[in-house]
Amino acid sequence: GDWPEPHDDFFITQWTKKGWVRGQGVFDVEMPNFNKDYSASVDSMPVPVITHEIGQYAVYPDLKEIEKYTGVLEPLNFKGVKQELENKNLLEKADDYLSASGHLAAILYKEEIERAMKTPGISGFQLLDLHDFPGQGTALVGLLNAFWESKGVANAEEFRQFSAPVVPLARFSKAVYKNNEQFTADIEIANYSSEEINNKNIKWALTNASGQPLQEGIIPLTNIKIG
């Protein structure tokens, strides 16, 4: 259903009667916008909401994974992709396809998780998936492969920047700015740790691609409740 029943203690869903609560149906029809969240979709929700199977962003097969299947399970899907690339003289592009699709997936997972954390009415999320799922055909939806190994597109430290007990968040209007435009952002903190954060200074910095600070400052003596 699209709304909880009278006796439900919580509600797990990908959409409500008021709209989507995951990136599907949003990211592919809207320009990138980091001000938005899913508040309108969960307005007046009477119970906690868990977003269902968010993510599912496909990554091109890592053909180096073929040699890891040494038991009874044959990676026929990977072998089929490899054969198709060979037939089209594109096998040398396989690593480029993996890298490009993988880094795009990492960006989308980041925005997916951060948008959920920006929504006051969402209590948690179920991810599909951190690793590829080989149980039903081909579901190469992970930043890790089926062996729980990195695909080289995001390491644990990078992933924890947007999926951790405490996550800094920024709201701003678009992804691309011209050099004559002013950049303005609102800073938020998602705190799902075991305790409140009290009387702490929050240091922020805006850096360029080389990591050099363009602007920085301190938000003084901030109290952050759990949630």
Regions found by a protein language model. Name each.
Residues K225-G227:
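Low-complexity, small/polar and acidic-rich linker and loop segments
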Residues G1-L144:
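Substrate-binding/catalytic cleft of secreted carbohydrate-active enzymes
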Residues F172-Y177:
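Short beta-strand segments of immunoglobulin-like
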Residues P32-N33, P168-A170:
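Extracytoplasmic loops and strand-loop junctions of Gram-negative outer membrane beta-barrel proteins
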Residues H52, L128-H131, F162, A190, ...:
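Generic beta-strand/beta-sheet core signal
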Residues N180-N223:
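Beta-strand-rich binding/interaction modules
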Residues V153-V167:
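Proline/serine/threonine-rich low-complexity linkers at boundaries of modular beta-sandwich domains
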Residues G142-V153:
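Short acidic, glycine/proline-enriched helix-loop-strand junctions
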